[in-house]
Amino acid sequence: GTSLLFLFLLSLLPLHAQTSPKHEVRAAWITAVYGLDWPRTKATTPAGIRRQKEELIDILDRLKEANFNTVLFQTRTRGDVLYRSDIEPFNSILTGKTGGDPGYDPLAFAIEECHKRGMECHAWMVTIPLGGKKHVASLGKQSVTKRERDICVPYKNEYFLNPGHPATKEYLMKLVREVVSRYDVDGVHFDYLRYPENAPRFPDSYDFRRYGKGRTLAQWRRDNLTDIVRYIYNGVKAM
């Protein structure tokens, strides 16, 4: 079955392991933010679709040649996605239009091409940040800030999912379940699973009073993030 793998920038393993790992992960991220890695071409015509696919194939070929064995493919950015979702809209980087259908499923294509090359493909999902006001406005009624108002909070001209609201982990679980149940991903990679930087005034005081249960604010927030990981891990394993 599909495994769920959470990779973090800081390893909890000793710096010098006593034994060699059975499987060495040599991974690279492929980001879609601003088209920094991919895509450069908009999928608005048959030729554009073909070129967009070719751009991804070229990246995968170069990674394979460089002896990488794992691709962390950006699957969710900030409240929008790069796969056919019933929950969130397509990212505008694909077609130039929010929610615009690129004429194919980028995640399915990435998985297929990775597997052809003997590489794993993990769904890289940004979790808590939802983007700035301009980005959120561009999503319109499709934005989670419109559909799930209770779990979204504005902070310093940006929007975030609220880790302290119990429904947040359920919403993220819906997204992960959608990906894991529909696609042959080899793992799920969580990014930005944290509170915003320098967030002493992050607006979660109501939830802290309601759910804090005697903990300090800092401990409660740490527990919230741990609970999200545990909830989704257990949920996927139970599928």
Predicted features and spans:
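Boundary at the C-terminal end of the N-terminal hydrophobic targeting segment
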Residues: 15-19
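Aromatic-lined carbohydrate-binding/catalytic grooves of carbohydrate-active enzymes
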Residues: 66-102
